[in-house]
């Protein structure tokens, strides 16, 4: 169940997002509200999360979700 549905804060800390945009998209779809990444992933992570959020919004607007 996405965390947004139950209105709780959900965070992930670790290296799982480093170089793995597929996992970032999975977390966004599940409603994660916070991530912490190591310094090597700081530049790429916001872009991965933003792209996943855009895809989710487009799917919702198209009625694909």
Swiss-Prot record:
InterPro entries found in the cross-reference section: Pyrv/PenolPyrv_kinase-like_dom, Pyrv_kinase-like_dom_sf
Superkingdom assignment: Bacteria
Single GO molecular function: catalytic activity
Protein name: Uncharacterized protein Rv2003A
Organism annotation: Mycobacterium tuberculosis (strain ATCC 25618 / H37Rv)
